[in-house]
């Protein structure tokens, strides 16, 4: 099986880079051949048991690194250990590297503009819209809208209908803490059960609406409040994936001190650590209400570049190009105060 190249644009340098997804060949083989797989095999691929087993072998099993190539992966993934909160010598296991903390207050600067939306994670980012009249409209390939939020969540389904969204895909080498993209009060916090399927580009294109099939945690933030970001309601959806068996809520207002669970009606500041994905690749999705946010122009331009190869193409009409973005960097702003913000 020949795999198409998957490229992305690094935001800081503007360079086009090629991604080498961890376990690329075997993961794509299993998912791209899913129509030929017995139903039991496909169910096993997305089960919590299988995901936890793979995570244990890769990150906890004493000989897992040598058996699955993790040591080679760690050597080649270009992790900047100088950013780490802990001394590098303490990061002596694959799990510790994956769950590392960084000095984000120094190495991930954030705009002082309170009405700007910041990226929730070190990730590769896609933009989209649920409104058919929008230039960013994407038909339901990545998720089924009602399934994503929950069919019984009528208030939120009505609030975000025809809105915009951001998909932030965390690859295995990334810093795996999620940070709050906006400031405001938590209006709802709940979990939707589901599978643990891979969120790599190949499997995502091979499956139907994968992000609404996987287990996910939904946090709804009201930003139209005093000291809020003023961009309406924002849904932050943290989605598990293959080898990600857990999402730990650990909100901190100062560095990583005194981590607290997320609770309804608590106020969250923008850019603070909110949660940690346990090992594997994973995805965070942001939903915005219609006409409340204007995305950064460089992210819009990158999305449809024709000189970059992407696996995000099947059933989409045209390839979609990811931009590699750092956590806490600006990805959009309140429309009312940033007229023309997203114009070329």
Give residue ranges: language-model regions.
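Contiguous, well-folded functional domains in the mature portion of proteins
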Residues: 1-344
């Amino acid at each position: 099986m020949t795999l198409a190249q998957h490229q992305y644009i690094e935001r800081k340098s503007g360079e086009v880079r090629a991604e080498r997804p961890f376990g690329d060949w075997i993961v794509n083989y299993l998912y791209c051949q899913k129509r030929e797989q017995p139903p039991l095999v496909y169910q096993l691929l997305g089960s919590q048991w299988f995901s936890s087993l793979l995570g244990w072998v890769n990150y906890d099993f004493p000989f897992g690194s040598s058996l699955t190539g993790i040591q080679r992966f760690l050597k080649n993934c270009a992790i900047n250990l100088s950013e780490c909160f802990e001394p590098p010598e303490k990061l002596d296991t694959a799990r510790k590297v994956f769950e590392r903390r960084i000095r984000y207050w120094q190495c991930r600067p954030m705009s002082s503009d309170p009405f700007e939306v910041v990226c929730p994670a070190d990730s590769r980012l896609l933009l989209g819209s649920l409104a058919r009249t929008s230039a960013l409209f994407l038909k339901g390939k990545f998720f089924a809208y009602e399934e994503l939020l929950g069919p019984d969540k009528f208030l939120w389904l009505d609030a975000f209908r025809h809105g915009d969204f951001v998909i932030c895909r965390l690859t295995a080498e990334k810093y795996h803490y999620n940070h709050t993209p906006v400031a405001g009060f938590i209006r709802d916090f709940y979990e939707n059960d589901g599978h643990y399927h891979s969120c790599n580009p190949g499997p995502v294109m091979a499956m139907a609406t994968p992000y609404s099939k996987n287990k996910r945690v939904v946090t709804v933030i009201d930003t139209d409040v005093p000291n809020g970001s003023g961009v309406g309601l924002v849904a932050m959806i943290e989605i598990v994936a293959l080898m990600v068996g857990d999402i730990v809520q650990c909100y901190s207002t100062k560095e990583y001190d005194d981590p607290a669970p997320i609770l309804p009606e608590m106020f969250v500041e923008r850019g603070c650590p909110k949660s940690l994905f346990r090992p594997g690749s994973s995805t965070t999705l942001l939903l915005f209400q219609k006409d409340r946010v204007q995305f950064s122009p460089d992210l819009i331009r990158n999305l449809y570049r024709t000189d970059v190869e992407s696996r995000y193409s099947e059933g989409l009409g045209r390839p979609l190009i990811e931009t590699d973005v750092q956590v806490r960097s600006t990805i959009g702003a309140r429309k009312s105060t940033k007229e023309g913000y997203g114009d070329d």
